């Protein structure tokens, strides 16, 4: 994934934070005596005194303007309507001597070179991080987009079916005869319906019936001789 490109405001802020090149804070200076009213622009500082000023790069020699030393510094910088050839010659002579200073030219060259280098680096960074730049398209070809599709299959096991319970056989229950009311006789009050209760269940015999000798003897056939003898012995 490409890094986000720096915005224009960020680049402007970086350029503002760079140190200014030499001569950016120049001053107006009056190089020769009080009679000379032609000001000269100094790239670094104006040094000397109010009556004798010259350009220099040493901040310790910089002239300090105040009302005691130079009560009217601005009036001395007024340009006359007509310039004499002597004034022009002296100004050109001072400019040629100032231009021959190698330190001031070297500082300006270094400042310009650093500024161009910073702008070049910022341009390269923008081109390699911005997708709309030609260098980005040449160095970083577009990759095909591969879409991975994952399919998840869920298998549901059948729930166990409950075993059928055996059904008990149904026996026919006892039938009860309903109560049939009698029609009321004329002049007789109607009797209330009696409460019907179901008949009690017949108790099942728990054992064989008791043995009775009389009943056992009566059940024997009359032609049995044993039966006849038993009757004779009974008092």
UniProtKB/Swiss-Prot annotation:
An annotated GO BP: intrinsic apoptotic signaling pathway by p53 class mediator
Mode of membrane association: Single-pass type I membrane protein
Localization of this protein: Endoplasmic reticulum membrane; Nucleus membrane
Signal peptide start-end: 1-26
Entry comment describing in which tissues the protein is expressed: Spleen and thymus.
UniProt key word Transmembrane helix: yes
Segments crossing the lipid bilayer: 106-126
Induction description: Induced in a p53/TP53-dependent manner in response to cellular stress.
Feature: compositional bias, Pro residues: 159-172, 181-211
UniProt family annotation: Belongs to the shisa family.
Function: Can induce apoptosis in a caspase-dependent manner and plays a role in p53/TP53-dependent apoptosis.
Domain notes: The proline-rich region is required for endoplasmic reticulum localization.
The protein, known as: Protein shisa-5
Organism: Mus musculus
Encoding gene, per UniProt annotation: Shisa5
